[in-house]
């Protein structure tokens, strides 16, 4: 007689950390893997109740802190009314129109048409398409050490070959110039559809351009009929010390890129231009650019509430004062250099080992 023995394997329950490491797509071989369960104001709390001061802010997303009641109430109300109904640009949706009106009321008159996206990199992609469509040119100029997102088009203009090389071939006809270089502006010609620049280079380590260089860039673009696209996805919404960083340079871009803090903690991006430029998407072909979740009603409601709070509480007016406080207290022989603009900070250490020690101590 043959006996059949059934072997039952009992799976051991995985911890959240194990699920994170095994079932969430990773972006680095050694993630922080902190298990955050709550956030309030400028504080984060892990599963063990340990408190952290959040100096990252979701990478410039949470400009008014975590758990803002005005934002939460706006999200709840809009979720009760309706969430997703149609791609943006086809139906009249109050959350979109109300937020677009608030944004354009606080921008120069030529930045009057808002195309909402679901993220910052999508805003970059949209601006690249719009520039090519409006000018009927193909060349796009960007800057070395820049960062505009990691989708295919945004990656093509990203200013560091280390990040680009593994994903080639990328978009053709991309020109990379040196940031803050007057001589390189001569490379912008009547074949250039647009120049895309961060108003303040963030990922490069808070590189602040000279006022005269920014004005020369604006002048060169005007002379050649090239659209100037300024990326304020990270430095916008007051983090730089003013609501929009470009106002510190006495210039106005043809297209403005927004994201991160735009959604008040919810996923939202936008590119903003004059209506005569934006209307290039309406024909030849129609639906020249569409986006299923761009301008999601709940995200627009959250973003509008966050921007209103930012303005009503006059938070931006305190940014430079807070910058001085940080600069006064950031004192160590290990810090080789500090670069800042408003509440954007970059600290340079002598080597990676010193940098890692600081990170480990903070965690």
What are these regions (language model features)?
Residues 1-2, 14:
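Accessible peptide chain termini
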Residues 3-9:
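Short, low-complexity, charge-dense intrinsically disordered segments
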Residues 14-363:
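Conserved N-terminal phosphate-binding loop of PLP-dependent enzymes in the Aspartate aminotransferase
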């Amino acid at each position: 007689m043959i006996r059949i023995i059934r072997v039952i394997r009992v799976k051991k329950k995985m911890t959240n950390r194990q699920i994170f490491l095994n079932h969430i797509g990773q972006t680095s071989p050694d993630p922080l893997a902190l298990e955050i369960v709550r956030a309030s104001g400028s504080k984060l709390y892990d599963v063990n109740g340990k408190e952290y001061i959040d100096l990252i802010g979701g990478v410039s997303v949470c400009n008014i802190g975590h758990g803002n009641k005005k934002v939460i109430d706006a999200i709840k109300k809009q979720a009760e009314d309706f969430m997703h109904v149609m791609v943006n640009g086809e139906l009249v949706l109050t959350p979109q129109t109300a937020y677009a009106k608030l944004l354009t009321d606080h921008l120069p008159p030529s930045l009057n048409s808002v195309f909402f996206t679901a993220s910052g990199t999508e805003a970059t992609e949209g601006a690249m398409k719009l520039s090519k469509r409006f000018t009927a040119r193909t060349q796009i100029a960007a800057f070395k050490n820049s960062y505009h997102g990691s989708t295919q088009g945004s990656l093509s203009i990203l200013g560091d070959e280390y990040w680009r090389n593994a994903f080639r071939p990328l978009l053709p006809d991309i020109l990379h110039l040196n940031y803050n270089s007057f001589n390189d502006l001569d490379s912008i010609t009547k074949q250039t559809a647009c120049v895309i620049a961060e108003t303040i280079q963030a990922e490069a380590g808070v590189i602040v351009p000279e006022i005269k260089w920014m004005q020369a860039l604006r002048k060169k673009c005007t002379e050649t009929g090239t659209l100037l696209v300024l990326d304020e996805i990270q430095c916008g919404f007051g983090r730089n010390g003013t609501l929009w960083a470009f106002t510190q340079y006495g210039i106005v871009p043809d297209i403005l890129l927004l994201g991160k803090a735009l959604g008040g903690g919810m996923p939202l991006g936008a590119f903003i231009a004059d209506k005569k430029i934006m209307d290039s998407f309406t024909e030849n072909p129609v639906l020249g650019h569409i986006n299923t979740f761009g301008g999601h009603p709940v995200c627009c409601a959250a973003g509008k509430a966050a921007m209103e709070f930012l303005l009503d509480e006059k938070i931006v007016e305190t940014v430079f004062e807070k910058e001085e406080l940080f600069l006064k207290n950031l004192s160590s022989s290990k810090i080789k250099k500090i670069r800042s603009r408003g509440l954007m900070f970059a600290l340079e250490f002598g080597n990676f080992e010193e940098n890692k020690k600081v990170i480990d101590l903070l965690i």
